[in-house]
Regions:
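Alpha-helical recognition segments enriched in aromatics with Gly/Pro capping
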Residues: 1-94, 189-191
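Small-residue-rich helix-loop
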Residues: 99-191
């Protein structure tokens, strides 16, 4: 007697489903790791593709998966590989890490953007960790520190905040002395 998980399908652009293949995106484990997903998150997600835990828990450690897995929860119907769900799950793993663990994983991206610089990496990590869902996003998220992107003046126009190009200048000028009086430049002090 043997048991296997149901077939994994991929969602096509037209909304239909077909057998998971490369046209749906990265399908191999190493490809997913290269795309910024953590091995633990990939394993967790794949386990959930054809199996439903009794308590509907979604985030597991590897040990937790081994303890909770039961063939009673295996579904007979096909599963659809959802990259958005995998990305969400990966973000949960990243946020659950200690700041030190996240910093260590982010270091290759930090060094890619700042190759000759030694910064307080944990401060940068404390800002990024709540926002990052895949490791390969980090270099793009911090690239503006090295080279400022072009910003459109429309950035200062917001109907909800009632800002326009004229009153935005006044608001920014009023913010300068307030920021200059800050003793410490921390997120808490600035907000």
């Amino acid at each position: 007697t043997y048991v296997h998980l149901p077939m994994i399908m991929g969602k096509n652009e037209d909304g239909s489903v077909s057998k998971l293949s490369k046209r749906h995106g990265s399908t191999g484990f190493s490809d997913l790791v290269n795309d910024g997903y953590l091995p633990e998150a990939i394993i967790n997600y794949i386990a959930l593709l054809g199996w439903c835990p009794k308590d509907n828990q979604e985030v597991f450690t590897l040990q937790g998966l081994a303890e909770h897995f039961s063939i009673d929860g295996i579904s007979k119907s096909q599963s659809i590989f959802d990259y958005d769900k995998l990305t969400w799950l990966n973000g949960e793993y990243l946020r659950a890490m200690t700041l030190e663990q996240f910093t260590q994983l982010a270091m290759p991206s930090y060094k890619q953007v700042f190759p000759q610089t030694d910064l307080n990496w944990e401060v940068l990590s404390s800002i990024l960790q709540p926002r990052v869902t895949k490791l390969n996003q980090i270099a793009d998220m911090i690239g503006f520190f090295k080279e400022l992107p072009e910003y459109s003046a429309e950035l200062f126009v917001n109907k909800k905040s009632k800002t326009n190009l004229e009153n935005s200048v006044t608001m920014l000028e009023a913010a300068i002395p307030v920021l200059e009086r800050l003793d410490t430049w921390t997120v808490e002090a600035i907000h």
